């Protein structure tokens, strides 16, 4: 069996080698020629998985060490009997702590308290539900928008138009598909409250970046249209700008790698179903107060410094992302 693995995936080297011929490659080097005789791929978002990559190959299993799969042509894989696995929820607490750092930055800059804001959470899955839970605990008034969940469950969800009209801050945690591409459009932006802030740690295409740039709204982006080639005007106008690393925590990366290994083990019947990286501490999740958050998060994560670095080194987006020092989760 031959397995090709993205060389930027952490903690994975040496794990599959006892059971397969393993080749490590940069995401951009994983091409049709490279995968022709591979049985399995373990990739990241930098590898687009479609007919161009997979045609006339032996690939029958693809795992992505990411929560989303919009870089994978799922219909093609289904038609050709290729198993696809992702890592939903793996980095939820890492993203939560990125959003927390962003909220702290905004609230302190405005000389306000959480009680002064209505926060709209769009996409209430693994990440969004955590953000909503903690934001309520911190004192924000929270409104939730999740049409698929509303259709399945009913409940107290709001439309995206209601979110736009009532919220001071909107934070996005949706997948990218035909229903969410440019969900934040020029039309929706016109409905938003004056000076409202948009936070995007989901997928770049969920927001029409140029429409936001030409509005009077603040925005904090971890994900960008066209990345790694950022629009310099959009980057310069951001209140907070980071290189697609919101979920880059030690634990989040360990979880993603473990989920890929477990999926590979299940599909190929390998004795790795209980594997987890050695030496990784799994923190006990806990609610912390707004006061504790404001006092402690700067020593764990200086988001302003990180934002300044990206604005200074925009052309190094990919290097900043690939060489990122993973953060430790602490709540």
Role assignments for model-derived ranges:
Residues 1-38, 143:
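N-terminal glycine-/charge-rich "phosphate-binding" loop or analogous flexible N-terminal tail
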Residues 49-50, 149-233:
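Rossmann-like adenosine-cofactor binding region
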Residues 40-111:
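Phosphate/diphosphate ligand-binding glycine-rich loop within oxidoreductases
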Residues 96, 115-136:
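Glycine-rich adenosine-cofactor-binding loop
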Residues 56-60, 80-82, 140, 194-196, ...:
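A short helix->loop->beta-strand "cap" motif at the edges of active sites that frequently abuts
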Residues 195, 201-331:
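Rossmann-like dinucleotide-binding domain for NAD(H)/NADP(H)
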Residues 96-110, 137-140, 238, 257-266:
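Oxidoreductase and adenylate-handling cofactor-binding alpha/beta cores
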Residues 10, 137-154:
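NAD(P)-binding Rossmann-fold cofactor-contacting core
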């Amino acid at each position: 069996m031959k397995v090709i693995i993205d060389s930027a995936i952490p903690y994975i080297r040496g794990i599959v080698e006892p059971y397969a011929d393993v080749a490590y490659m940069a995401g951009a080097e994983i091409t049709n020629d490279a995968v022709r005789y591979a049985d399995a791929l373990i990739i990241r978002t930098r590898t687009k998985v479609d007919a161009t990559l997979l045609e006339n190959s032996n690939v029958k299993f693809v795992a992505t060490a990411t929560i989303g799969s919009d870089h994978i042509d799922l219909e093609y894989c289904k038609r050709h009997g290729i198993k696809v696995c992702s890592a939903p929820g793996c980095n939820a607490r890492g993203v939560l702590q990125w959003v927390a750092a962003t909220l702290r930055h905004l609230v302190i800059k405005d000389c306000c308290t959480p009680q002064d804001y209505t926060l709209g959470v769009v996409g209430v899955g693994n990440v969004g539900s955590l953000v909503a839970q903690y934001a309520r605990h911190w004192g924000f008034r929270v409104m939730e928008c999740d049409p698929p969940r509303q259709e399945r469950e009913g409940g107290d969800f709001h439309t995206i138009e209601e979110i736009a009209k009532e919220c001071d801050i909107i934070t996005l945690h949706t997948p990218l598909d035909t229903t969410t591409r440019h969900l934040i459009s020029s039309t929706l932006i016109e409905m938003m409250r004056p000076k409202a802030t948009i936070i995007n740690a989901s997928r770049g295409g969920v927001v029409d970046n140029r429409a936001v740039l030409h509005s009077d709204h603040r925005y904090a982006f971890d994900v960008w249209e066209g990345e790694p080639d950022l629009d310099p005007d959009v980057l310069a106008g951001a209140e907070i700008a980071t290189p697609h690393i919101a979920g880059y925590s030690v634990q989040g990366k360990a979880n993603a790698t473990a989920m890929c290994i477990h999926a590979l083990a299940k599909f190929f019947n390998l004795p790795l179903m209980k594997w987890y990286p050695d030496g990784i501490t799994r923190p006990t999740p806990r609610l912390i107060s707004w006061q504790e958050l404001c006092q402690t998060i700067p020593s764990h994560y200086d988001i302003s410094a990180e934002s300044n670095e990206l604005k200074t080194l925009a052309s190094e987006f990919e290097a900043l992302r690939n060489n990122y020092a993973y953060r430790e989760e602490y709540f």
